[in-house]
Amino acid sequence: MALLQWMLENISDDNSIKMSLEEQHETFQINVKWLKFLNLSDSDIVQLQNVYKLVQRDRERLIIYPDPQNVHSWSYLCSPEEIKVIIVGQDPYPDGRGHGLAFSTVRGCSPPNSLKTIFAELERTIENFKAPAHGSLKSWCAQGVLLLNTVFTVIRGVPMSHEAIGWQVLSNRIINQLSEKMQNLVFMLWGSQARKLVSLIDSKKHLILECAHPSPRTKGSKTPFIGCGHFLKANKYLQIHNKCPIDWNITNDL
């Protein structure tokens, strides 16, 4: 309630604001190709401006992850028309290891526990997969895997601290537009937060894969991550629809 009151008192709600794609790019630092694809409404733009004001307010007094230049790095590593698989995460790692890609870390950082679980499932199902010592998943992005958090920033040391500031206006739009405009995509929804997005996806056009979050804290779930087989299922679906499967092995050249 305190956050909502602050927003009402300090942030303009001028729905008459018009922004060109170039202005949106300068303001939000999202790739222009994605901005064209998303076709944000005036209302979306105003809400995003409000989110950015809140993030900037926090940056002035706290440490916020990731750095501004990496908040939307997802939009620069694969174009909308290249997307084949969408893996939905929650929010950035609160220890600074992230770089704007769900579950991925900067090179030189060891994989967090959730990513170790992901690697364990890959080792279980993908022939010759070997877990790397680092946690960068950029090589997946180069093949059309969108690693998308539903919340794009976080206060250092406080997981989900920016969950309530409004980032979902963007992440929901991304999911919705991919579902509407594309065909035969694979959506991997891991955990309760990601599974809330299922209503935004047309199951007649796309494959939706759901299971527990790979965090060790979800051990014992009715739909555990280990054993989900999502990576194999995704590749089989892509091949059925005449798309190249994903090479899930983590390369060392990115």
UniProtKB/Swiss-Prot annotation:
Subcellular location: Host nucleus
One annotated GO molecular function: uracil DNA N-glycosylase activity
Top-level enzyme category: hydrolase
SMART domains assigned to the protein according to its UniProt record, in alphabetical order: UDG, UreE_C
Swiss-Prot/TrEMBL catalytic activity: Hydrolyzes single-stranded DNA or mismatched double-stranded DNA and polynucleotides, releasing free uracil
E.C. number: 3.2.2.27
One annotated Gene Ontology cellular component of this protein: host cell nucleus
GO biological process, one term: base-excision repair, AP site formation via deaminated base removal
Active-site residues from the entry: 91
Source domain of life: Viruses
Family annotation (Pfam families): UDG
Keywords, alphabetical: DNA damage, DNA repair, Host nucleus, Hydrolase
Family according to the record: Belongs to the uracil-DNA glycosylase (UDG) superfamily. UNG family.
Function: Excises uracil residues from the DNA which can arise as a result of misincorporation of dUMP residues by DNA polymerase or deamination of cytosines. Therefore may reduce deleterious uracil incorporation into the viral genome, particularly in terminally differentiated cells which lack DNA repair enzymes.
Official protein name in the record: Uracil-DNA glycosylase
Organism: Human herpesvirus 7 (strain JI)
